[in-house]
Amino acid sequence: MEETGDSKLVPRDEEEIVNDNDETKAPSEEEEGEDVFDSSEEDEDIDEDEDEARKVQEGFIVNDDDENEDPGTSISKKRRKHKRREREEDDRLSEDDLDLLMENAGVERTKASSSSGKFKRLKRVGDEGNAAESESDNVAASRQDSTSKLEDFFSEDEEEEESGLRNGRNNEYGRDEEDHENRNRTADKGGILDELDDFIEDDEFSDEDDETRQRRIQEKKLLREQSIKQPTQITGLSSDKIDEMYDIFGDGHDYDWALEIENEELENGNDNNEAEEEEIDEETGAIKSTKKKISLQDIYDLEDLKKNLMTEGDMKIRKTDIPERYQELRAGITDYGNMSSEDQELERNWIAEKISVDKNFDANYDLTEFKEAIGNAIKFITKENLEVPFIYAYRRNYISSREKDGFLLTEDDLWDIVSLDIEFHSLVNKKDYVQRFYAELHIDDPIVTEYFKNQNTASIAELNSLQDIYDYLEFKYANEINEMFINHTGKTGKKHLKNSSYEKFKASPLYQAVSDIGISAEDVGENISSQHQIHPPVDHPSSKPVEVIESILNANSGDLQVFTSNTKLAIDTVQKYYSLELSKNTKIREKVRSDFSKYYLADVVLTAKGKKEIQKGSLYEDIKYAINRTPMHFRRDPDVFLKMVEAESLNLLSVKLHMSSQAQYIEHLFQIALETTNTSDIAIEWNNFRKLAFNQAMDKIFQDISQEVKDNLTKNCQKLVAKTVRHKFMTKLDQAPFIPNVRDPKIPKILSLTCGQGRFGADAIIAVYVNRKGDFIRDYKIVDNPFDKTNPEKFEDTLDNIIQSCQPNAIGINGPNPKTQKFYKRLQEVLHKKQIVDSRGHTIPIIYVEDEVAIRYQNSERAAQEFPNKPPLVKYCIALARYMHSPLLEYANLTSEEVRSLSIHPHQNLLSSEQLSWALETAFVDIVNLVSVEVNKATDNNYYASALKYISGFGKRKAIDFLQSLQRLNEPLLARQQLITHNILHKTIFMNSAGFLYISWNEKRQKYEDLEHDQLDSTRIHPEDYHLATKVAADALEYDPDTIAEKEEQGTMSEFIELLREDPDRRAKLESLNLESYAEELEKNTGLRKLNNLNTIVLELLDGFEELRNDFHPLQGDEIFQSLTGESEKTFFKGSIIPVRVERFWHNDIICTTNSEVECVVNAQRHAGAQLRRPANEIYEIGKTYPAKVIYIDYANITAEVSLLDHDVKQQYVPISYSKDPSIWDLKQELEDAEEERKLMMAEARAKRTHRVINHPYYFPFNGRQAEDYLRSKERGEFVIRQSSRGDDHLVITWKLDKDLFQHIDIQELEKENPLALGKVLIVDNQKYNDLDQIIVEYLQNKVRLLNEMTSSEKFKSGTKKDVVKFIEDYSRVNPNKSVYYFSLNHDNPGWFYLMFKINANSKLYTWNVKLTNTGYFLVNYNYPSVIQLCNGFKTLLKSNSSKNRMNNYR
């Protein structure tokens, strides 16, 4: 709808949705939900002040340099450009490629078109004479690019919104697509747009007569001329202001001349860009002039060029027709892609073997088809340079099984193949080096020759095997290597000294002993490799090893003087070098490596530092006593091994890799390789000799291979963790814009709020309004206190006014602390109370928005540039609102450092910066290409254009180059094919990116635009499939083959697309097509597998660019808790001990807060006041911090219930999230270390304790032993008070019960003023006392009295238990019919008595225990105050037990 001169703006609440059910439209801003009219701004008349606009435009166009330019220079420039065009032909599409592309796109090319270097359309017959004029006009048009760019820079949309359904697509927000209609266009006579009018093909508008056609063309020209007269209206500035801006900022093209030089030098190697330098010949004194090429590095600082990606390397990446990410990965690979057919086959098998691990195929699964898919993927990546998103979207049938339920190579698999391809090329380079090295030695070694013959197996293609070969050559052929070095360099003297000692040994007579061992290292390798004794060892017929070596020493005493007096040294030397030969044998190493990799186990061995530092709650707690961890463990939990490696680097532990039965394994290898079956003494001696050497060799091999496996395991675990990080990040990116009402799916207008630190009434509440396009409209500062009870309506009215003014469809909120939750509930209350709804009567949802991007944005350089005068909280709210519109674009606009700083995964710190960056970038690439980018919107919207670098084939440099190329066009793109015809993209990058760069189809604009625009350009259908899409449309419409053939011949197949989109029954017609049969027929005729492409075509014809992302995810429950508090399930959980600060008292409850500002409640039963029967405010102080135990967490209200009781605080519950299964956890070692640590802590505590001084006559600075020594000479009942080993809140009374018998009584102190002061409350045996004297009088003296009463009783016997037992037995024999009982002291448990008795001489002797208390004698659950009562009670108990026994016997 367009506004006429006397029309009025429609109020926002009266606006109507136009064409709600128009499903035929392709992606446009309307579908993003933008309103047609903007009530916050007024449209300006496009014809206003034309004279002023003309002045401004003239100011843009006039260029003094152009006016003063010499005509010859202009001709020279044309020639250079012509040369450049010729040199670019190699990078561009060939004529056949272009013909095919144009045919698929539905455009005919004639021979004249094919021969045109600029790929223009054919001219009409009467217009050939204007060709030269048009060509020259292009130069003038290109000079006006800078003018149009400045006009684009200052242009802004006058309308805020358009009506229309959002249609759930990716067109997140940015600028209205109508901006592109209003973009300023160059209108010089003979300009590029005038040319396009003359290049309409004959079959277009064939029914028009010449007069009608000319009138139509003139109308178009008139419209364009009018659009030029708008610069002041577009910018909203006067010409004086615009001139002033030019004076200050320039036009942004001051250095185009330098870039032009650089581009020419890169593209066509023009030698004109050279500067002469003069040099003086030192010998002759003559002056010589030399030429030096001028580059950007001669003009700018290298660091600035690197920062702006403009070094020579960057410019080369820009211009090379290979995806940028591939160029970066392949930078270190020489001669990439030139592999032999054998290496290509090996790569396919090698990569298939690695990828198949994740596919969990059955053991008998036929991998032929899978390897074919892997081979296809490798070909697409290495030969065709197609990036992962393109392969997954448009070549999926080539990377999947033909069976419906078969395998599919996922995007993860394809990215793995990309990395593995680089790894394999590096391996091939190393292999080629070793081969050249081997060839130059001019030797024939069977081991090396066999290795290179068998290199077509995947297991051979490992770097470790190749390293074995190289080490073997260095070890065995050191002399030959030295000779080769001398021959190559002409220098004498040995350079290769690595194995010089072995060479000396091999040249000595002692080496003869190695031959007498009876089997060479090569034969041992053959035996072990075949697991059979192919070459049995031969024992010396007559001599033992010692005798053989002694005979050699005697025969060569002159040459072996060092060994003559030391036979043992000679034996050790022979064993050493024989074991060295064994350890270097490649077949032995390969067999051991293969077995070790399958069956290794990993153990953790703690260092002293690790035992001390790895405690509960430590990052490495779960690996402290890890043992017997298998490869499967680490595949399931890769972070576990990475933590082991990290802890090892910190010297906390060492990771030991070993085989489960390593000793038995070594014995087995020895038996099949070196052991003879002879039983003679000589044979036994030689077996022992060989075994010692073999064990030495195996120790060395296991040491090397263990390190290799550890390195490989580290790399594989890093890949697995990186993949997990990538998936977690993809869930963040894979969110569609927030849609408040699914029945009205439009991008919402957003009001975002934050209460900052939550100091209500003191700090302002900030609100920000952002419209549907993501434009910041205004911010609000609310100074009213939302919790002011005296005038609550004031805040409510303010909020209501803001909402009525903005008419938002959704409200987003977040903040730095839990007070935001209180504010959130208040907002809900206000909206409900005042029944606030949006302009369409819908409820306005309030959601918590993820603020990790907003936190980084508010203080970023980007925010300072966008909103220099706004405070951080306003910028924070802007980012919240933008996040609701597009999480993807918010993340895409972060810098690489900011992205890496995101907390994505708990183990991302285990990855290197490069690994983390690659994982995050591939996630970006997958999601951005799922969504795609609208080309014309990206041209003048930097925020939206940030996603371009992740488009398939692009990167940071190519995205910059792409945008610059688009801006130089100075007009919107009308068709994808223009990316090729306008030389914006070359063949490979176009193929990669075209399907993910779309051009919005807008019906309103069609009558003004060139007919080159194709409706399929606004779909996910790739241009290579346009012709296929038109055939699908024709078949769906059920046209007969003759009509289809006629349209195909005329090049008007695209009409079927338009007809289908207008057909109301198109869904039923498309869904009725048998795509499987069609795909089979297509493959049979063309060899192309297109079933997935056909499915994509049908979906896109039904609903172009349907939203494929997941719904927006507002924060919920524990996510809100974590966002507002910063606490996680590992730092704040039920049972955790946390510090809390007392804020206030409520009745007898205590209100506290944690460091993260979580409000905690201590009810009256969970603090010491309940036990002491005192109010809480007498025991606890406001502002003071106390340890507390979390009892319950209320995530919804962000509160918790905690306990301050001592017994709760001392019993912290720490959940164990790892297994302590004895098979994988060293429980025995854990217990031993715990006991050792306890003893050590006790010893350290005793050594470091400060001696307390208690002002009491019985207090002595003794320990337990010293107290006993002091009392040993004292009387019974004497005592001392001393320190306790339990800590400064305990004391001990040590008192003497009898000779060498002492009791230590614990006194617990409460309510201490300081650690060394005496507590105000003292507890002994659960009884409370006020001071030490009270304990002495009421407790200790009573026990002494009762002890004396017992020892004075006739029923007490002194002496040991053995003595008393003997006395009772003797008494019972003398008096067989009498019962007997006596008490005695329990020397094992001071403070207890034995009660021993016999019923008669024939009964057994019974022993009961009696406890001495301060109130009596405790026997069988009863306390007796005197000895007499104790004896009577004992007799009563005895009679009762006897009666029960008789009753039981009777029954």
Swiss-Prot record:
InterPro entries tied to this protein: RNaseH-like_sf, RuvA_2-like, SH2, SH2_dom_sf, Spt6-like_S1, Spt6_acidic_N_dom, Spt6_death-like, Spt6_HHH
Acidic residues: bias regions: 29-51, 88-100, 153-162, 194-211
Phosphoserine, modified sites: S94, S134, S136, S148, S155, S206, S295
Pfam family, one: SPT6_acidic
Subcellular location: Nucleus; Chromosome
UniProt family annotation: Belongs to the SPT6 family.
Protein name, entry field: Transcription elongation factor SPT6
Organism of this sequence: Saccharomyces cerevisiae (strain ATCC 204508 / S288c) (Baker's yeast)
